[in-house]
Amino acid sequence: MPKTLTEKLNAIKAAGKGIFVPYIMAGDHEKGLDGLAETIHFLEDLGVSAIEVGIPFSDPVADGPVIEEAGLRSLAHGTSTQALVETLKTIETEIPLVIMTYFNPLFQYGVENFVKDLADTAVKGLIIPDLPHEHANFVEPFLANTDIALIPLVSLTTGIERQKELIEGAEGFIYAVAINGVTGKSGNYRADLDKHLAQLHQVADIPVLTGFGVSSQADLERFNAVSDGVIVGSKIVKALHQGEPIQDFIRQAVAYQK
C-alpha cells in the first residue's frame, strides 16, 4: 500500500496542479520551537502541498549561507532533535511534513527511536542529504513498516542507469537537485538541465520535485513544466526571518496549473 506522502502528492499531480513544498528551519523563530506550529499553520493556510522541516546541524554541508545561518539561529534558541520531536508530537496539521536532517543528529538520537517517536505525528517523509544510497540500509529497515518515506536525492549529473538505481522502490517523491553545489545558488543551472529533468521524470513512477536554487516566478514556471513541482528553501527562510511578505509568491506556486 502506498505511503501517505505518495498518495497525497500523486493526487495533486492527478489534478493537474504543480506540487509546492516550502522548506523551513525548525526553531528559526523568535519563539524558537514554540513558533513552529505557527509557521506550519501559516503555510498550511496558503495551501502548500507538504512542508520540509529542517533539523539544525553545526556542519550542514549541503546548505547555502541563508539556511546555514538559520540553523545557527535555531541552535542559539536551544533547538535539539529531542525537543523538536516532542514539539512535533503536539502539532496537528493535515499537511504532510518531511524532515530534512543530516545523518549525525539522526545517529545520535538513534534511528529506530527517531522513527518510533515520530510514528504518531504528521511526519510522512525523511530526507538525509549526506547518506549515500549504498548506506540507505542504515535507515530503510526501520521505515519499512511505517508511513514515513525515505526521499532519494538525485543529482542531474547522474547517468540514467544510476538514476534508475537511486529511485527504485522509492516512496513519497524524487528530489531532483537542480544545481551543482549548495542550496540557494539560484541561476547556476547547466545548459541541458531541462532535458535531464524530463528524462528523470520519464523513468520515475512517483512525483519528481526540483529543488536547490529555485527562487523566482520564472523558476516556478520552468521547473513545473519539466517536473511535477518545486521545493523552495532559501527564499522562504529568508522572508520568514526578515518579516518580508512571501504570501503572493506561495499563492502563485500553489495555484500553478499544468
Swiss-Prot record:
S-S pairs: none
SUPFAM superfamilies per record: Ribulose-phoshate binding barrel
Gene Ontology cellular component annotations, sorted alphabetically: cytosol
Keyword presence, Signal: no
Catalytic function, reaction form: (1S,2R)-1-C-(indol-3-yl)glycerol 3-phosphate + L-serine = D-glyceraldehyde 3-phosphate + L-tryptophan + H2O
Gene3D superfamilies: Aldolase class I
InterPro entries hit by this protein: Aldolase_TIM, RibuloseP-bd_barrel, Trp_synthase_alpha_AS, Trp_synthase_suA
Active site residues of this protein: 52 (proton acceptor), 63 (proton acceptor)
Pathway: Amino-acid biosynthesis; L-tryptophan biosynthesis; L-tryptophan from chorismate: step 5/5
Alphabetized GO MF terms: tryptophan synthase activity
Spans through the membrane: none
Domain of life: Bacteria
Known EC number: 4.2.1.20
Keyword terms, alphabetized: Amino-acid biosynthesis, Aromatic amino acid biosynthesis, Lyase, Tryptophan biosynthesis
NCBIfam families: trpA (TIGR00262)
Family label: Belongs to the TrpA family.
Subunit structure: Tetramer of two alpha and two beta chains.
Reported function: The alpha subunit is responsible for the aldol cleavage of indoleglycerol phosphate to indole and glyceraldehyde 3-phosphate.
Entry protein name: Tryptophan synthase alpha chain
Organism: Streptococcus pneumoniae serotype 4 (strain ATCC BAA-334 / TIGR4)
